[in-house]
Swiss-Prot record:
PANTHER family: NADH-UBIQUINONE OXIDOREDUCTASE CHAIN 5. It comes from Scyliorhinus canicula (Small-spotted catshark). It is a multi-pass membrane protein. Belongs to the complex I subunit 5 family. This is NADH-ubiquinone oxidoreductase chain 5. Its EC number is 7.1.1.2. It is found in: Mitochondrion inner membrane. It comes from the Eukaryota. One of its GO terms (cellular component) is mitochondrial inner membrane. Keywords: Electron transport, Membrane, Mitochondrion, Mitochondrion inner membrane, NAD, Respiratory chain, Translocase, Transmembrane, Transmembrane helix, Transport, Ubiquinone. The keyword Transferase does not apply. Signal peptide: none annotated.
Length: 609
C-alpha cells in the first residue's frame, strides 16, 4: 500500500514537472505551445491522484508517512517527509481538478498575451508549491511550499507589471505575507530550540508537557497573514489587479487556504490550548463579519467575490476555534469549486464587456450569456449555503457546531450576521449583473460559445452541485456528531440565509426610489471605504512616520546639533571675545585716551607703591 501511494504521488510530481523541465531545453522539443502541455499535465495528474484517493477510502486507512534522510546536523536531522492522510489525499484531487478547469479557461482568457507560456508555468509552479505544502510532514518542507506560494503570488499578481496598481498590489501582498512569515519562522525557531525536531509527528509527542502559547501565537500570525484575517486582510482585495485566472487559483485552492491548512495540520498542538482557540474564534468572527460588511457596497465584481473569500476564510478560522478542524477542511474543499467558478464567470463577463468590472454598468446578461449566468447563479447560491448545493453541507455543519458549542455566543452572533450578509451581497451581485436591462455599450463583443469557456464552467458547476454530498458521504466524522437538536437550531443557518435574501430584495427595490446621488445611510462609507483601513494603514501611518522623521531631523540635527552644539554655537560663543578684541582697533579718541590713562595709572602704581 505504501508503494502505491509513493508511486502515485511521485508520478504526479513528475507529470507536473515535465512542462517545466522541457522548457529549460535550448531547442524546442515540440512546436506546440507549452501552455497546452501544462493543462494536459494537470489533467493527467488529476486522474492519477484519484488512484490513492479510491484506495484510501476503500481501505479506511489512517495515514501513511514516508521519510528520506536529507541532511544531518548532529542531533538535528532534516528529512524529506511526506504524509498521506485524509487531508492531503483528498485535497490534492480537488486542487488538481479546480486548477485543470482554471488553466483551460486561461487558454481563452489570456490567448492574446505574448507571454502566455510563462504565465502557465507560473500557475503550474503555484500548484506544485501548494501540493508540497499539503503533503509535507515536517516544518522545513512545509516552509518551502509556504514560501513557494508566496513568491508565485507576487509574480502572478504583478503579471501586468506595466500597471502601477498591479505592482503596488503585488508588493502589498508580499509585505502583508512577510508579517505572517515572521510568525512562522519564529515558531520554527522555537520548536527547533526546545524540541530539537521539525518532524510534525515528533513535535506532537515531544510537546506534551511544554507551554506552547508563544509558538502557537506565531502560527496564528502566520495563518492570519496568509489567509487574510482581520488586520492583515487589505492585500486580498488588492490582489484582484492580477489576471482573473490568477484570482481564481489564488482564492480557491492554493494560497489563501494555506494558512488555514497550517492550523489544520498542526491542530493537535492547538486543541488543548484555550487561549489560542479563543483567539482563533474571535479573530475569525471579526474577519467574517467585517469583510462581509465591506462586500455589501462594493461595485467591482471581482472585489465582491474577493471579500466573500475573505469572509469564508474567517468562517474557517471560526471552525478552527471551535476545535473542529475537519469541518474547516470540508469547507476548504467545497469552497474551492464554487469560488473558482464565480471568478471564471466574472472573467467571462469582463472579457465580453470590454474589460468592464463595474456591476452598475452591466445588467441583462441572463439572455446574452446564458451559460455564464446560470453558472454564476449556481455559484452564488452555493456560496450562500442553499440546501443540497456543496456549500450547504459545510456551512450548515459549521453553524450547527457553533449552535451546539458552549463557547463564545458573541462569535456565534457575528457569524450568523455575516451569513445573512453573504446572502445579501450574493443576490445583489446576481441582480446587478444578470437582471433587468443592459447598461453597457451595445458594441461589446459578447460571446461565450467557446469550449474553453463552457467546459471549465461546466466541470466546476458539477462540483458546486454534488461535491459537498460526495465528500461528506466519504469523509468519516472525526468527532461524535450531535444526535439531537431543536428545529430552530437546525434551521438557523437556512433562516438567516433566507432573511438575507429577503433583505437584499428589499434593498434592490429601494434603489429604484432613491432620488439622491449619494447614499444617506451613515455606515455606507464605512463599508465602501473598507472600514477606512487603506487610508489609515497605507496613508495616515506613513504620513505620521514621515512627519515625525522630518520633525526629528529638523529639530535634532539642524537646530540642536548645528545651532546649539555645533558650528553656529561655537560662533555665537566667540562673538563677545571678538567684539572685545576688535573694539580698541576702531580709531576712537576716547578709546586711546582711556588706554593712555590706564597705562599711566599702572606705571604710577608700579613705581611708587
Amino acid at each position: 500500500m505504501n508503494t502505491i501511494f509513493n508511486s502515485s504521488f511521485l508520478l504526479i510530481f513528475i507529470t507536473l514537472m515535465i512542462p517545466l523541465v522541457t522548457s529549460l531545453s535550448p531547442k524546442k522539443l515540440n512546436p506546440s505551445p507549452s501552455s497546452f502541455y501544462v493543462k494536459t499535465a494537470v489533467k493527467i495528474s488529476f486522474f492519477i491522484s484519484l488512484i490513492p484517493l479510491f484506495i484510501f477510502l476503500d481501505q479506511g486507512l489512517e495515514s501513511i508517512v514516508t521519510n528520506w534522510n536529507w541532511m544531518n546536523m548532529g542531533p538535528f536531522n532534516i528529512n524529506m517527509s511526506f504524509k498521506f492522510d485524509l487531508y492531503s489525499i483528498m485535497f490534492t484531487p480537488v486542487a488538481l481538478y479546480v486548477t485543470w478547469s482554471i488553466l483551460e479557461f486561461a487558454l481563452w482568457y489570456m490567448h492574446l498575451d505574448p507571454n502566455i507560456n510563462r504565465f502557465f508555468k507560473y500557475l503550474l509552479l503555484f500548484l506544485i508549491s501548494m501540493i508540497i505544502l499539503v503533503t509535507a510532514n515536517n516544518m522545513f518542507q512545509l516552509f518551502i511550499g509556504w514560501e513557494g506560494v508566496g513568491i508565485m503570488s507576487f509574480l502572478l499578481i504583478g503579471w501586468w507589471y506595466s500597471r502601477t496598481d498591479a505592482n503596488t498590489a503585488a508588493l502589498q501582498a508580499v509585505i502583508y505575507n512577510r508579517i505572517g512569515d515572521i510568525g512562522l519562522i519564529l515558531s520554527m525557531a522555537w520548536l527547533a530550540m526546545n524540541l530539537n525536531s521539525w518532524e510534525i509527528q515528533q513535535i506532537f509527542i515531544l510537546s506534551k508537557d511544554k507551554d506552547l502559547t508563544l509558538p502557537l501565537l506565531g502560527l496564528v500570525l502566520a495563518a492570519a497573514g496568509k489567509s487574510a484575517q482581520f488586520g492583515l486582510h487589505p492585500w486580498l482585495p488588492s490582489a484582484m489587479e492580477g489576471p482573473t485566472p490568477v484570482s481564481a487559483l489564488l482564492h480557491s485552492s492554493t494560497m489563501v487556504v494555506a494558512g488555514i491548512f497550517l492550523l489544520i495540520r498542526l491542530h493537535p498542538l492547538i486543541q488543548d490550548n484555550q487561549f489560542i482557540l479563543t483567539t482563533c474564534l474571535c479573530l475569525g468572527a471579526i474577519t467574517t463579519l467585517f469583510t462581509a460588511t465591506c462586500a455589501l457596497t462594493q461595485n467591482d465584481i471581482k472585489k465582491i467575490i474577493a471579500f466573500s473569500t475573505s469572509s469564508q476564510l474567517g468562517l474557517m478560522m471560526v471552525t478552527i476555534g471551535l476545535n473542529q478542524p475537519q469541518l474547516a477542511f470540508l469547507h476548504i474543499c467545497t469552497h474551492a469549486f464554487f469560488k473558482a467558478m464565480l471568478f471564471l464567470c466574472s472573467g467571462s463577463i469582463i472579457h465580453s464587456l470590454n474589460d468592464e468590472q463595474d456591476i452598475r454598468k452591466m445588467g441583462g446578461l441572463h439572455k446574452l450569456l446564458p451559460f455564464t449566468s446560470s453558472s454564476l447563479t449556481v455559484g452564488s447560491l452555493a456560496l450562500t449555503g442553499m440546501p443540497f448545493l456543496s456549500g450547504f453541507f459545510s456551512k450548515d455543519a459549521i453553524i450547527e457546531a457553533m449552535n451546539t458549542s458552549h463557547l463564545n455566543a458573541w462569535a456565534l452572533i457575528l457569524t450568523l450576521v455575516a451569513t445573512s450578509f453573504t446572502a445579501i451581497y450574493s443576490l445583489r451581485l446576481i441582480f446587478f449583473t444578470l437582471m433587468k436591462f443592459p447598461r453597457f455599450n451595445s458594441f461589446s463583443p459578447i460571446n461565450e460559445n467557446n469550449p474553453m469557456v463552457i467546459n471549465p464552467l461546466k466541470r466546476l458547476a458539477y462540483g458546486s452541485i454534488i461535491a459537498g454530498l460526495i465528500i461528506t458521504s466519504n469523509l468519516p466524522p472525526a468527532k461524535t456528531q450531535i444526535m439531537t437538536m431543536s428545529p430552530l437550531l437546525k434551521l438557523s443557518a437556512l433562516l438567516v440565509t433566507i432573511l438575507g435574501l429577503l433583505l437584499a430584495l428589499e434593498l434592490t427595490n429601494l434603489t429604484h426610489s432613491q432620488f439622491k446621488i449619494y447614499p444617506t445611510f451613515p455606515y455606507h462609507h464605512f463599508s465602501n471605504m473598507l472600514g477606512y483601513f487603506p487610508p489609515i494603514i497605507h496613508r495616515l501611518l506613513p504620513k505620521i512616520n514621515l512627519n515625525w522623521a522630518q520633525h526629528i531631523s529638523t529639530h535634532l540635527i539642524d537646530q540642536t546639533w548645528n545651532e546649539k552644539i555645533g558650528p553656529k554655537s561655537t560662533l555665537i560663543q566667540q562673538i563677545p571675545l571678538i567684539k572685545l578684541s576688535t573694539h580698541p582697533q576702531q580709531g576712537y579718541i576716547k578709546t586711546y585716551l582711556t588706554l593712555l590713562f590706564l597705562t599711566l595709572t599702572l606705571i604710577i602704581l608700579v613705581v611708587f607703591i
